[in-house]
Regions:
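Acyl-donor-binding surface of acyltransferase catalytic domains
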Residues: 9-134
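Extracellular glycan-recognition regions
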Residues: 2-7
Length: 161
């Protein structure tokens, strides 16, 4: 894969998760769409969203329960995209949702690799590729960040050190 393919793939998945078009992430204006459940969305997402904001730098795409469209629209149009994802700006969004009995909950940042920067690194551990039968006994609390017992049918490949 090259850098262009990586960002296109990420935008396509984000578009599926949010219920928008991949091109929405490169527009010059913010976009608001109604959040819906999509069977091709990431399996751990609880859809539809009340409010989910995503930016690849140009703008913000907001996938929302339309009851809260005005709150979100006012918020994302008040600040530059990068400032919508940091405090103290997020306190304003939190305050608006708190009036409806909700609070800002999860904040995540994902970083896409630059292919020209990737190099194989030495590893002092033996790596083992495992398949479902190999890791069926590893659904334990200490591995819950990697394996999910609630969706174990989706776990098909694992690399362990």
């Amino acid at each position: 894969m090259n850098n262009s393919q990586i960002i296109s793939t990420a935008m396509a998945q984000s578009a599926t998760d949010l219920g928008c078009a991949p091109e929405d992430f490169i527009k010059d204006k913010n976009i608001i769409v109604e959040s819906t459940a999509d069977p091709n969305a990431r399996k751990y997402l609880k859809l539809p969203f009340i409010c989910d904001l995503v930016s690849y730098g140009n703008n913000i795409v907001a996938s929302v329960d339309m009851k809260y469209k005005d709150i979100v629209e006012q918020y994302i149009n008040r600040f530059a995209p990068e400032h919508c994802f940091e405090t103290p700006s997020m306190h304003i969004l939190n305050d608006a949702f708190q009036a409806h009995g909700m609070r800002v909950c999860f904040m995540a940042e994902y970083f896409l690799p630059r292919m020209e920067s990737l190099q194989e690194q030495p590893c002092r551990y033996e790596l083992k590729v495992m398949y479902p039968n190999d890791f069926k006994d590893l659904y334990l609390p200490q591995w819950s960040n990697a394996l999910c017992i609630d969706r174990k049918d989706l776990d098909v490949l694992c690399v362990g050190a």
